[in-house]
């Protein structure tokens, strides 16, 4: 598994194979090898802990000459910065032969890459500090039983948090959480507007899109109906221009439209011309959904019709969408009964026109057989929103109901691009990285408080364990779980060593799970009311990733690396 991870290094070619004597092979029985493997993660820990909890990180991007500032609230950009760091280490090693013989650097890069693959998108101060602390304890006692104790401790914490996670439903509690997560009142007000538009039902990260706006204030646009997982046909520039998509970026039709579903690839213009003529006379637009492609004379006729109607001030347009079986739960058009019902096709799946089997070409004469209807559409080349006033409960099958939802687009305003980018990243992180996961699966107290609450149970687990070395592993977990809180209290509040220890002891002794002190001279506060929460699913995935990495590294007895050639320059 380690070798597979190490071979994913772009276009650089391997100079040596495993069979040669020149390939660096390291035995993990030598603890210094494992310590070198951990060195890259320690560097990452310093970066993450110094830029977490209201801190900022200054870095120079790969393609920019000026330093950039990344806030601790912008976890997505922080993750990208770490990926750039890993890429730079790989490139430096491939282009510098001296670095290839530098064992600590090579192993540090290997460990860092493996850690990033295990932890995935849960790169936090918690994941790095736990990993470094637990492995340092393992290096002192490199026994399998110690690893078992570490795994038992981490699994106990995961079970404890799963049983005690907090479900937040009250709008007041959600608003308090938003106030805590945002940096300004304008950000919190925009987020509250979005939540109100979807009735505080933010259970997925694809419900709200946060984009750069072109005004000085924020705008909220709500798209209701069926979220169609494919956009307007984009294979022909002339067709896109006929819909004015390159300039307007969006096709929005708020009047009743005809709907025609076509099974197969539409090439022959004679199959669509009767529909074009019928729609032009009705001055209605047509939503044409093809299970294949639309090309040749048929697409040319559609383009000419759109341009002609635009010149004549006729509102009729032909909007072509491609049907994706994969994006519709692997259902063929004839099998997607919920979608057929939503489009109000008059004869169900018999209304899907097939040039091979249907006796009549769709036209005015057989309109009651083929044409459905929708009330409005908003579409780009990436996705579309179809709206019909239909009761969601009337749709029998449960799986496609995920397409029936309100989707909100929040356009971020500001006085310059820097302000807009900063606010967009922060708000997007708050909505789609924190709130959506927490509202869907539950919250736990933030600032590492939830890990402190598990300490009494870990002590009991340790006391009941008969094996001494397993106890050592559990004790390593007990020592590690206080580190995230130490970082949080120091960075967020600037407390000294004694104040931090006092707060940690108070959180451990407080029996109520959501209660904790955030100031040495104050009473315990409810983290739900105060808004100091974080998503349970994120912490659970973080602990699972740490456990996976530790198990992978401690169960491996050999690390095989590669020597890479410099990339050859191709002559023009």
From Swiss-Prot:
Residues 1-16 form a transit peptide. Keywords: ATP-binding, Chaperone, Membrane, Mitochondrion, Mitochondrion inner membrane, Nucleotide-binding, Stress response, Transit peptide, Transmembrane, Transmembrane helix. Its main location: mitochondrion. Residues 17-471 are mitochondrial matrix. It comes from the Eukaryota. It is found in: Mitochondrion inner membrane. GO terms for molecular function: ATP binding; ATP-dependent protein folding chaperone; protein-folding chaperone binding; unfolded protein binding. Belongs to the chaperonin (HSP60) family. Chaperone. Required for the assembly of succinate dehydrogenase subunits. Ensures mitochondrial gene expression at elevated temperatures and prevents heat-aggregation of the ribosomal subunit VAR1. This is Mitochondrial chaperone TCM62. The gene is TCM62.
């Amino acid at each position: 598994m380690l070798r597979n991870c190490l071979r994913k290094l772009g276009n650089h070619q391997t100079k040596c194979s495993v069979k040669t004597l020149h390939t660096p092979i390291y035995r993990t029985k030598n603890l210094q090898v494992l310590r070198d493997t951990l060195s890259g993660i320690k560097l990452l820990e310093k970066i993450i802990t110094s830029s977490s909890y209201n801190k900022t990180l200054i870095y120079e991007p790969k393609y920019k000459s000026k330093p950039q500032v990344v806030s601790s609230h912008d976890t997505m950009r922080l993750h990208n910065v770490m990926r750039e760091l890993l890429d730079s280490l790989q490139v430096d090693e491939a282009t510098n032969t001296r670095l290839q013989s530098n064992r600590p650097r090579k192993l540090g890069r290997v460990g860092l890459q493996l850690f990033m693959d295990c932890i995935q998108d849960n790169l936090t101060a918690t994941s790095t500090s736990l990993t470094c602390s637990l492995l340092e304890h393992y290096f002192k006692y490199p026994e399998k039983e110690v690893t078992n104790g570490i795994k038992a401790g981490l699994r106990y914490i995961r079970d404890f948090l799963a049983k005690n996670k907090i479900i937040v439903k009250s709008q007041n509690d959600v608003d308090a959480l938003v106030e805590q997560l945002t940096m300004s009142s304008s950000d919190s007000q925009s987020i509250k507007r979005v939540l109100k538009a979807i009735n505080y039902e933010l259970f997925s990260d694809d419900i709200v899109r946060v984009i750069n706006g072109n005004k000085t204030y924020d705008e909220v646009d709500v798209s209701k109906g069926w979220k169609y997982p494919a956009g307007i046909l984009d294979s022909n520039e002339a067709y896109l221009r006929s819909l004015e998509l390159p300039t307007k970026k969006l096709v929005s039709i708020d009047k009743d439209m005809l709907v025609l579903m076509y099974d197969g690839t539409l090439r022959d213009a004679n199959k669509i011309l009767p529909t074009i003529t019928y729609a032009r006379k009705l001055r209605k637009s047509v939503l044409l959904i093809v299970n294949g492609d639309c090309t040749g004379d048929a697409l040319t006729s559609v383009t000419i019709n759109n341009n002609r109607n635009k010149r004549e001030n006729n509102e009729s347009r032909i909007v072509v969408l491609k049907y994706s079986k994969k994006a519709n739960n692997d259902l063929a058009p004839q099998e997607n009964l919920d979608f057929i019902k939503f489009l109000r096709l008059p004869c169900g799946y018999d209304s899907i026109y097939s040039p091979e089997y249907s006796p009549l070409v769709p036209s005015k004469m057989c309109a009651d057989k083929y044409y459905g209807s929708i009330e409005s559409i908003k579409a780009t080349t990436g996705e579309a929103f179809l709206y019909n006033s239909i009761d969601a409960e009337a749709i029998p099958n449960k799986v496609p109901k995920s397409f029936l939802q309100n989707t909100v687009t929040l356009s971020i305003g500001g006085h310059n691009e820097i302000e807009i980018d900063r606010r967009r990243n922060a708000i997007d992180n708050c909505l789609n990285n924190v709130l959506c996961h927490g509202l869907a699966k539950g919250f736990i107290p933030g600032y590492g408080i939830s890990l402190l609450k598990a300490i009494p149970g870990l002590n009991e687990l340790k006391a009941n364990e008969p094996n001494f070395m397993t106890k050592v592993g559990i004790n390593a977990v007990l020592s590690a779980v206080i580190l995230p809180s130490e970082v949080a209290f120091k960075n967020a509040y600037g407390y000294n060593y004694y104040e931090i220890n006092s707060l940690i002891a108070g959180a451990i002794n407080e029996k109520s799970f959501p209660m904790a002190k955030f100031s040495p001279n104050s009473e315990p506060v409810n983290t739900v009311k105060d808004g100091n929460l974080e998503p349970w699913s994120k912490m659970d995935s973080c602990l699972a990733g740490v456990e996976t990495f530790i198990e992978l590294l401690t169960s491996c007895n050999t690390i095989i690396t590669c020597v890479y050639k410099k990339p050859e320059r191709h002559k023009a």
